[in-house]
Design a protein with these regions (language model features):
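Terminal amphipathic alpha-helical/low-complexity segments used for targeting or macromolecular assembly
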Residues: 1-105
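Structural signal for interior beta-strand "rungs" in well-ordered beta-sheet cores
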Residues: 107-111
């Protein structure tokens, strides 16, 4: 995939991964209470995207040197970090072990 993806494309990718690549593994990632972790995470993606948009807006409104949203998204390391931190937060809330820490450390090492 090149360029940006939207929520519909992400959902299509998830369905592909569920059905084609991980058909045996996917159902195995359920918690004892029956919550399917990938489904629970992907259900939060629109909210993560909304929050990231508010992060972009905050930079745009508070940095007079920024001409538009595109510059914030493409050139600010903050955005790279916030995407990882927001996803890690959702995973942590779902009780996923290790991966949230890995995501935050990845963002930390790059920013």
């Amino acid at each position: 995939m090149n360029g940006f993806v939207n929520i519909a494309q992400l959902k299509q990718l998830v369905l592909y991964l569920q059905g084609e690549i991980f058909p045996d593994y996917y159902p195995a990632v359920e918690r004892p209470d029956g919550l399917c972790l990938p489904d629970a995470f992907w259900a939060q993606v629109p909210e993560i995207a909304r929050l990231i948009n508010t992060d972009v807006d905050a930079v745009l409104h508070n940095d007079p040197a920024v001409p538009d949203r595109g510059e914030v998204i493409l050139s600010y390391p903050l955005q790279y970090a916030m995407i990882h931190y927001r996803a890690a937060h959702v995973l942590h809330q779902l009780g996923v072990p290790r991966i949230p820490r890995m995501l935050t450390e990845l963002a930390h090492s790059r920013t």
